[in-house]
Regions:
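Catalytic domains of carbohydrate-active enzymes, especially glycoside hydrolases
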Residues: 40-56, 246
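Active-site-adjacent loop and "lid" segments of alpha/beta metabolic enzymes
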Residues: 2-6, 10, 27-41, 60-82, ...
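Structural preference for beta-strand elements that scaffold enzyme active sites
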Residues: 14-18, 51-54, 90-92, 110-111, ...
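Phosphate/pyrophosphate-binding loops at sites that engage ATP/ADP/AMP, CoA/4′-phosphopantetheine
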Residues: 46-50, 163-178
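Active-site loop-to-helix "anion-binding N-cap" substructures in soluble metabolic enzymes
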Residues: 45, 50-52, 90, 95, ...
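Short polar catalytic/cofactor-binding loops
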Residues: 20-24
Length: 272
């Protein structure tokens, strides 16, 4: 059975490296869409210090059309086995579909990074059947383009969601050590909603491990004025280090090397 607690015990704060096998992801679409480029990217992520590799075949970025389940599986069936074969660290699959999750686990993936934003019995059964890790993401609005009114307490809303998801998972017979919590920065939230989540990791991290995925996102561009997402890696690394110092257990990033450098500075303060 996969355990986030055991992985963190040996490594401390974890860096999850992003590997998108999509032509349309918001900052790196089309970069890893062949066997050779996938192997090169896996090796790069591992050499740079990734603790987990998160594979996505269906972009949920704003303004992108969600592909069919058939297309998502088609992208994965010839590339995912290559990724698992060449990875010396756990691999997660970024999907909201239980059939895709089951396929990925059959191919050797260890973690489901679930962006659905709702407890689903089919997904829960897949997680239970394979003893997989399960990351819950708070979705905000009905999709990545919408936002709802949190009445000034987005952190409270996210924590309530985490509590509900945790209870349902435990009631279903899934171990607490299999669970991870992602507050969903940039999903169904305004920039004003995203800001307090970054600043309130101390409260949010009462659900552990807390995952923060702020890499290259619009909030980084808003703060820094950097328009091109690919130019936001240094600022993203600073944000990741701040969230870890405030209690985040996992940071999901595009540039692992720069993030590891930032975390090494934080570790000197005795945080990690």
């Amino acid at each position: 059975m996969f355990s986030f607690a055991e992985l963190r015990e040996s490594k401390g704060a974890l860096v999850m490296g992003i590997l998108n096998i999509t032509p349309d992801s918001f900052s790196d679409g089309g970069e890893a869409f062949s066997p050779d480029s996938v192997i090169e990217k896996v090796n790069e992520l591992i050499n740079d210090g990734a603790d987990i590799i998160d594979v996505g075949a269906c972009s949920t970025a704003p303004n992108n059309t969600i592909i069919s389940e058939e297309e998502e599986l088609k992208r994965l069936e010839w590339l995912l086995p290559i990724i698992v074969e060449h990875s010396s660290v756990p691999v997660s699959i970024d999907t909201f579909r239980s059939n895709v999750a089951r396929f990925a686990l059959q191919k050797g993936v260890s973690v489901i990074n679930d962006e659905s934003g709702a407890f689903n019995n089919d997904m829960a059964q897949v997680v239970k059947d394979y003893g997989a890790g399960w990351i819950f993401m708070h979705p905000g609005g009905t999709d990545s383009k919408s936002a709802i009114d949190y009445n000034g307490d987005v952190t409270g809303a996210v924590m309530s969601f985490f509590g509900d998801m945790k209870k349902e998972a435990l009631d279903y017979g899934i171990s607490e050590s299999q669970l991870c919590y992602d507050c969903g920065i940039g999903f169904g939230k305004t920039r004003d909603d995203d800001m307090p989540q970054n600043a309130d990791c101390v409260r949010l991290s009462s659900f552990s491990p807390l995952l923060i995925g702020v890499s290259r996102k619009r909030i980084i561009g808003h703060i820094t004025g950097i328009e091109d997402p690919k130019d936001r890696d240094f600022a993203s690394a600073v944000a990741a280090a701040i969230t870890v110092s405030d209690g985040a257990g996992i940071v999901r990033v595009h540039n692992v090397a720069v993030t590891k450098q930032a975390l090494s500075i934080v570790s000197k303060k005795g945080v990690l």
